[in-house]
Each structure stands twice: as C-alpha cells, then as structure tokens.
C-alpha cells in the first residue's frame, strides 16, 4: 500500500510539473495555393509548439475578425507541445490585408502575423 501511495504521488508531481512548462506558439500564415488576384484560395494559420493548450486564434481581414473560420482538432507532438491549423476560404486582391492573431499565456499582448503573398 505504501508503495502505491509513493508511486501515485510521483505521478501527480510529474503531471503538475507539465503544467508549469510554458512554450510560446510558432505562427505561420500562408495560402494553400500560390496567390493570384481574384482567384479563390484558402488562408491558413498554423500554430505549433505551444504549451499549455489554452489558446485563441483569429484570422483577420483588414484588421477585422473573419467569422467563417474552421480549424483542426487540437493535437500534440512528441514533445507534448500542441498544434492547430485554422483556415478559411478567401479571394486575394491588391487592397485587402490578411493576418492571424494569436492570444496565449506566453504573450503579454496578442501577436499578429501578416500574410505575405510571396511566402
């Protein structure tokens, strides 16, 4: 019984230690296909390498939140960090600016990464 209690305590301590680890997300914004003005495409925001899992991701058009956005299920890598893909249909043109805004405990303010059509 004492051995079980010791093992249980060690497991709990190791799990609580995982919550203390914080890793900032890496943010990548790109289109599914090479951008052509007036041609429908998909805008992707891939957020990876973050911990803990609580995160808020918004796709933006001219600084305003795009409402019709889909995303993958929250998944984790071998190192126990998390990753997600947010995406939406869009039609690029010369005047509109697109970006991905991410809020995470590792950022003091939300971080915004702009989409560059040549990336």
Swiss-Prot record:
Pfam families: C1-set (PF07654)
Signal peptide region: 1-20
One of the record's GO cellular component terms: MHC class I protein complex
InterPro entries reported for this sequence: B2Microglobulin (IPR015707), Ig-like_dom (IPR007110), Ig-like_dom_sf (IPR036179), Ig-like_fold (IPR013783), Ig/MHC_CS (IPR003006), Ig_C1-set (IPR003597), MHC/Immunoglobulin (IPR050160)
Location of this chain's protein in the cell: Secreted
Domain Ig-like C1-type: 25-114
Record GO biological process: antigen processing and presentation of peptide antigen via MHC class I; immune response
Keywords: Disulfide bond, Immunity, Immunoglobulin domain, MHC I, Secreted, Signal
Disulfides per UniProt: 45-100
Family named by the database record: Belongs to the beta-2-microglobulin family.
Function recorded in the entry: Component of the class I major histocompatibility complex (MHC). Involved in the presentation of peptide antigens to the immune system.
Subunit note: Heterodimer of an alpha chain and a beta chain. Beta-2-microglobulin is the beta-chain of major histocompatibility complex class I molecules.
Protein name in the entry: Beta-2-microglobulin
Classification of source organism: Eukaryota, Metazoa, Chordata, Craniata, Vertebrata
Gene: B2M
